[in-house]
Each structure stands twice: as structure tokens, then as C-alpha cells.
Amino acid sequence: MQLSWNKCSAGRWCLLHEVDLAAVDYQGVFVVWRNGGLDQISGVLYVGRGTLRGEIIDCRRHPVFKDPGLLLTWARVDHTRDLDSVAAYLYQRLRPIWGEVVPSAQPTAVNLPLTA
């Protein structure tokens, strides 16, 4: 399955705490990560799924995601029945530090966000 991963202006990844979610009123999957540098390691923190606006707002409120430099991308998934299998694939491939494993879903391969 081919997903369209969203970016913000000038083709840059969005900041979790700054992206305007007004138009993100559909279901899909999202990834929260941090870029590394000299003092920290890059890593995927979370893979989420569901109604995107609500799920991303919940992440913003959680203390784990308080770092203002966290990055975000999301993609629409048209069919509810595909959400768990897409999330299962992303979880297997991206190995987030936090999140829910989706053990009952057969993973459906998708293009990964960092290749978008």
C-alpha cells in the first residue's frame, strides 16, 4: 500500500507541537520521532493510528512528548479495516520506543515515512 506522508512548508517535517491540525480530520497513521545530534540519538518514539487529530492532540498532552523539537508526519488510511495492519507494519519496521504492539493484525507493507 502506498501512503502519502505529510510534510509542512518547504518540504520540511512538521514539529509535533506546532503543526496546525485543523485540516487533519480523517483517520490514518502517524509517526513521532526526534532527530539526533551531537548530544542525542535519533529515534522513532511512537507509531499511532486512529482519528488523527484526536490521537495527535493526545500525544501533545502526554509528558513523554514534551520536547518541542519532536517531529511528526501522518498519512491517511482510507479503510478502517486497514489501520491495524498498517500500524503493525510500521511498528515492526520502525521499532518505536513507546506504543502499542498490534499482535492480532497481519502487517500490510507500506512505504516508510522517512523515504518520502
What feature does the model see in each segment?
Residues 1-58, 78-92, 110-116:
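GIY-YIG nuclease catalytic motif and its immediate N-terminal context
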Residues 54-73:
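A broadly used, surface-exposed interaction patch
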Residues 60-64, 91-94, 98:
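Generic secondary-structure transition motif, activating predominantly at the C-termini of alpha-helices
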Residues 96-109:
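Coupling/hinge elements of helicase-like and P-loop NTPase modules
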